[in-house]
Amino acid sequence: MKRLFLCTLLCAISCALAYAIDIPKEHIYIFERSTNSNYVCYDINLQEDGKLNQREPVRGYWVLDEETRLGELTFFERKVAFGIRVVSIKEQEAVVYMTAYKDLKIRVCKHKGKWMGIVKLNGHEMVLQKMFAQMKQSIYPRCEYVDIYGTDIKTGEKRRERIKA
C-alpha cells in the first residue's frame, strides 16, 4: 500500500512539474508547422554583460506537447531546417537567417526598448512575430509555402506575406 501511495505521489508531482515549465513569453519569433502543435521558439541570447552572444545571438528550441516540455533542436534540424546562421554581428545588432531559407535575412536588434527580429518583404519592413509552414504529408514531407506574420514598422498594421516553396 505504501508503495502504491508513493508511486501515485511521484506521478502527481512529475505531472505538476511538467505543466510548470517556464517558457519565456517574449520571443524574437516562433516557427509553427501544419504537421502538429509543436513549434520552435527563437529567443535572444545575451551574454552576462547584456551584449549579444557573438557566436549564437539567437537560440532556437522546441516547445513540445502543447507547452509541457522543451526540447533541443537536433544536429540535423539545426543544419538543414531550423538552425540560425549569422551573416553579421555587432554589439547590439545581428543579421541572421534560418538554414532552410537563406534569402530571408532577419535583423535582430532593439526596437522601442525590446529585442525584435525585423524582416523586409515586398518593400515593407516588419517586426517578425511568427512563421507558419504548410506541409504536404508523404513519405518525404514537403513544404508548400511559408506564411510570415508581423507588424509593419511604419504603419503598425498587421501583415502576412507568403513565400511559395
Listing of model-derived features with the role each one plays in the protein:
Residues 28-33, 84-86, 133-137:
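Short amphipathic beta-strand and strand-loop transition segments with alternating hydrophobic
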